[in-house]
Every structure is written in C-alpha cells, then in structure tokens.
A protein has these predicted regions:
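Electrostatic cytochrome c docking/interface patches
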Residues: 19-40, 52-57, 111-137, 211-213
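The canonical Cys-X-X-Cys-His
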Residues: 43-49, 105, 141-151, 202
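N-terminal export/targeting leaders of redox proteins
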Residues: 1-31, 74, 208-213
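Sequence context surrounding c-type heme c attachment/ligation sites in exported
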Residues: 33-44, 62, 70-71, 133-145, ...
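Axial heme c-ligation environment in periplasmic c-type cytochrome domains
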Residues: 54-60, 76-120, 155-160, 179-209
C-alpha cells in the first residue's frame, strides 16, 4: 500500500461508502499545489470540501487542531497509525505528502467552520454529558474535558471532539480498546474501563456539541 499510486489510492477512496467523485487533476507529489486545491480535489472525496464529511465512516476535520491533524498525517505517512482506515486509505495518500504539504492541509482544515448537529436522545445526552464533564468516578475514569477542553475543542495534542460523528467516535474508541492500531495514547487504558453503552453515550453527546449546551 505504501507504494500505491495516486490514481490507485483515489480509486480505492471512490469505491468506499460515503465518498463522492472529485476532479483528479492534481498530483500529490507536486509540492507547488496549494493546500486548498489538494483539500478540494483529493481530501474532499471523503472528508468534504470544508472538512464536514457526510459519512460517519470518515471523520470531520473542520475546526480540528492543526497540530493534531499534522501529527496524524505524519503517523499515516510513517505507517505508525495502522487502524483499518489508516492502511486502507490514508497510507497511500499520505505517502506522497511533504512536511510543508501536511502543515498546509492541517492549517486549511483547522480554519474551516464545523457544522452544528441536532441533539440525540435526551437520556443518552444526559449520560454522555456526565461522563464528559465528570468522568466515571467508580472506575477512576477522568472527565473527557480534562484533556479535550470544556467545549470539547481540543487542547494541544488532544483532538477536537465537538461535532464529530457519533459512529466514528465509537469506532475509534473500540480501536483504542481492542487493537494496537493507534499506539502511544492514554486512551487505551481509559477505553478498557468503559462499557459499550458509556461509549455510545459520550460519543452521542459529543456529536451534538455545541447544541448540547
């Protein structure tokens, strides 16, 4: 996969659920292509032109911390992040990116405006809010906001979670819990303490941010 051509990588992407066809006239190996053009003609295929993806199979990138995005792209490029979407889609794409291109793409998506989502089930929202703000004390699980910020906006190397797809968040929590696909994170220990119901609740609450307030 690491040596996959741009066209092959994009062919894989266009066959995946939730991806729409885009113009494929740019070569990722060309460092002179502006980040906005790469985002529009390549990344938008799954993540949306403005980073607000439609399909929960692909994360929303709008408003994400640029440092976090850059780190994830670097991890894809070096194959350190090996969860299934990583090696199926992002390894081939990120292999073509230079450091400057990664920085430019991260800054582009960080400047996009995240969509606001409607709240989910009221009981789920209440349970998710409790975990986000207070943690799960009897399991010694810290509040999510301790690392991700009181508005789930992300802090430093910790990602923005506000407005992210519920299904995507749940899948990532299971990746942390069940695999070694995302090493070097405190989330692995935390997710081992959470039930499936607790994961669903906090992910549903985060998807509705900031309308949950």
């Amino acid at each position: 996969m690491r040596g996959i051509s741009l066209w092959s990588a994009l062919a894989i992407l266009t066959s995946a659920g939730g991806c729409a066809n885009v113009e494929r006239s740019r070569d990722l190996s060309n460092p002179n292509v502006p980040p906005a053009v790469t985002a529009t003609q390549v990344c938008s295929n799954c993540h949306g032109v403005d980073g607000n993806s439609v399909s929960p199979n692909f994360p929303r990138l709008a408003g994400q911390n640029p440092g976090y995005l850059a780190t994830q792209l670097e991890n894809f490029r070096s194959n350190q992040r090996s969860d299934p979407p990583g090696f199926e889609y992002m390894w081939g794409i990120s292999h073509h990116l230079s450091d400057d291109q990664i920085k430019g793409l991260a800054e582009y998506f960080a400047k996009q405006v995240p969509q606001v989502n409607a709240p989910v089930d009221a009981r789920l929202m209440a349970a998710g809010k409790a975990i986000f703000e207070n943690g799960v004390s009897d399991k010694e699980v810290a509040p999510c906001m301790a690392c991700h910020g009181p508005q789930a906006q992300g802090i430093a190397s910790f990602p923005r979670l506000a407005g992210q797809h519920q299904d995507y968040l749940v899948k990532q929590l299971h990746v942390f819990q069940e695999t070694e696909g995302r090493p070097g994170t405190p989330m692995k220990q935390i997710t081992h303490l959470l039930t499936a119901q607790e994961m669903e609740a906090v992910a549903g609450y985060l998807q509705a941010f900031p309308s949950a307030q």
